[in-house]
Amino acid sequence: MAEERFDFREAEPRWQRRWDEEGIYKVERDLSRPKYYALAMFPYPSGKLHMGHVRNYTIVDVIARYRRMKGYNVLHPMGFDSFGMPAENAAIQHGANPAVWTRENIAEMTAQLKQMGYSYDWSRAVYTYREDYYRWTQWLFLQFYKKGLAYKKTAPVNWCPSCQTVLANEQVEDGRCWRCDSVVTKKDLAQWFFRITQYADELLEDLKLLEGGWPEQVRIMQQNWIGRSEGARVEFTLEATGDKIPIFTTRPDTIYGVTFMVVAPEHPIVEKICTSGLIPEERVAAIRAFQEKMKHLSEIARTSTEAEKEGLYTGLDVINPFNGEKAQLWIANYVLMDYGTGAVMGVPAHDQRDFEFAQKYGLPVKVVIQNPEGTLRAEEMTAAYVEPGIMVNSGPFDGTPNLEGIPKVIAYAEEQGFGQKTVSYRLRDWLISRQRAWGAPIPIVYCDKCGTVPVPEKDLPVRLPDDLDFTGEGGSPLARHEGFVNTTCPQCGGPARRETDTMDTFVCSSWYFLRYTDPQNAERPWNREDVDYWMPVDQYVGGIEHAVLHLLYARFFTKVLRDMGLVKVDEPFARLLTQGMVLKDGSKMSKSKGNTVSPEEMIAKYGADAVRLFIMFAAPPERDLDWSDAGIEGAARFVNRFYRMVVSALPAYQHARSLLPINPADPASVMGALSEAEIAEGLAKAAPNLTAEDRELRRVIHATVKRITADLHDRFAFNTAISGLMEMTNAIYAYREKQHAEQNTSALVLAEAVQKAVLIIAPFCPHLADELWSRMGHPRSIHLEPWPAYDEEVAKADTVEIVVQINGRVRDRLEVPAGISAAEMEAVAMASEKVQALVAGKQIVKVVPVPGKLVNIVVKG
């Protein structure tokens, strides 16, 4: 065969232009067809695509292209999550206008995405930094505000001194800023929050709806983040003042073992103690110093299991309401004000953290759960006892198995009026305020007369000024911009001040998938009919790093909007795939390691189709992929081999066309192309004349189409699908060596094989497929064609290989007719010369045939 090569440098841009000009990927609501919404997490416009992007988007594009060919009405959009700190940092460091910087980066990345041949409907692109998008982000904030789901309060927040902004709990990793790695400190600020805790139970409960569609790891991560705990709330009393100090515990069965209480340094009772004159000034000074030290530690640093437990005695005691015993009141680093009640009972005998704290500070240990052997002695303990046991030293509950005692202790507290059963959550309300300028402004004004006033919807958007002064110092540039800050009150018309915080960029990305359904709408964020038709997203693909952040917030938004009557779905993403990373030499790609691979360079050298093929072939999508130069070269070789196979088969294809009547109503037929139906009809008539080689190639082709269809439809086994495509290619080459294209039956068989192969490669290598489809005479794009069909009867093998075992060891392999009975299999196996020689002179105990697979012969002697 001629060494003809696929000229990707000429063909790929040409097909991209044609797809764009013809708008073949544009999509509208169509109630007559099943819909499929395929979505990749949209990128931040950093300016350059990296291989992680390419892998993510290629996975989704293959899914989208396959579903289109299967007859689905496919929504496959793209946009840019374009607010955030990198643009602002560029403005600070280089004097760039963040809007211009963002726009230029988007243009560059859009060109790169088009180079990859992705089948996006670009008319639906969304850009979160544009007014036509953030207007609706602000509108949604106002709806949350009306429902009491957006509120402002002063709270200790995570503060990044480098980024000069507040971070959500989820954005603090090991005590450091997730973006710049600076140590995070605490700061008291008035902040805006979304009341996500109001949906905690539903967010937790509805994870069950995602079983089978979402990775178990992601569901567990969200479950742990929400952190629902059932237990009891019990009120202890500060002996000196009578103040009640509530605690939350999941172990009320141990409450008789309390020997101390620990409160967070920020707890209101600490301030009261320090200002009441109840303790000496030197102790007050020590407490103040301890509080100041804690301000510079993040929650992660304070609560880490590796962190040393630090505490300070307040000098006062609390009274245990169950037994009237006194317990010392301490403050400690490991108790947080925003988890539970900010106060924790100390039971060192039955909680390891409490035990370590008691050991360090010489606090008493009291056993109240005895082990089955009855051998626990407080003075002999080297660790807390946390296993089940019998309640002791517990008043009326002595002798009760502790697990049975939990509800009894709670009931007693409720009867006595000092406690009740309750549920606590690890999840905190979502802090959305950011002291940065490059974000969606919060649509609130402050009036001395009217107080906090929401901006009327008719006045949206609250626009970002074009002339902000980005120095990187002194908080947000918005707060220093008098033209932005000073405004008039919408209620009284008097002077007012705008809110200068912007919204966390995760607010923008919590609803973008809804805007894609109706992105040009200037009257509302989306049309209800469109959003109800397209939602939920059928397949979402993105990194595992978003398991808690983005995915939890998007679920929360969807549930709130459902309750407002704006959407009907309970969950936004029916199925989730978290793709693995792209590695080089076994390590994550990074500039510092010098192991990055540029997508642009790879496209220039090998073509987009070869890059796509390698990425989909090298590893299953959920696993990490190690970039291989040999692998991409192999993919490029296969692209050319496939191209040569089809081009060399064109004479046979044209001969097959000449054998069948032309349909004058079909442009493809007139231009020399064949439809699947025409080929099938021709082969049905030619069936009596097919040779064994003809039938075998047809069997391989139909069986492989069946297998690849299952690989793509059911399990996203892209690598095995490509392996099947390679098997088809090898089978066609082998057939060509044996058969003559001028023979009528051979021409028809080859035409069928080549046509199905080109259709199957289309989702993976879209440019190559369209180029070959065009050369075969088809006037319209292959991406508008249906997925190839397969015939179950044709796919069946005439013969199968069975294994013959003797006492479990393989002794022979035999070709037998497909569909052979168990009795016939036994007879064939026993007739084997190898088997007869091995069983000669031995007693045959039994013969166990497994139809279509094996015969096991059990012998003795």
UniProtKB/Swiss-Prot annotation:
Enzyme Commission number, as recorded: 6.1.1.4
Binding-site residues, ATP: 591
GO molecular function ontology, one term from the record: ATP binding
Keywords, ordered alphabetically: Aminoacyl-tRNA synthetase, ATP-binding, Cytoplasm, Ligase, Nucleotide-binding, Protein biosynthesis
Top EC group: ligase
Pfam families referenced in this protein's UniProt entry, alphabetically: Anticodon_1 (PF08264), tRNA-synt_1 (PF00133), tRNA-synt_1_2 (PF13603), tRNA-synt_1g (PF09334)
GO biological processes: leucyl-tRNA aminoacylation
Ranges spanned by the short sequence motif 'HIGH' region, renumbered to the chain: 43-53
Positions of short motif 'KMSKS' region: 588-592
GO CC terms in record: cytosol
Cellular localization per UniProt: Cytoplasm
Reactions catalysed according to its record: tRNA(Leu) + L-leucine + ATP = L-leucyl-tRNA(Leu) + AMP + diphosphate
Cited InterPro entries: aa-tRNA-synth_I_CS, aa-tRNA-synth_Ia, Leu-tRNA-ligase, Leu_tRNA-synth_edit, M/V/L/I-tRNA-synth_anticd-bd, Methionyl/Leucyl_tRNA_Synth, Rossmann-like_a/b/a_fold, tRNAsynth_Ia_anticodon-bd
Superkingdom, natural source: Bacteria
Membership in a protein family: Belongs to the class-I aminoacyl-tRNA synthetase family.
Protein's name according to its UniProt entry: Leucine--tRNA ligase
Species name: Symbiobacterium thermophilum (strain DSM 24528 / JCM 14929 / IAM 14863 / T)
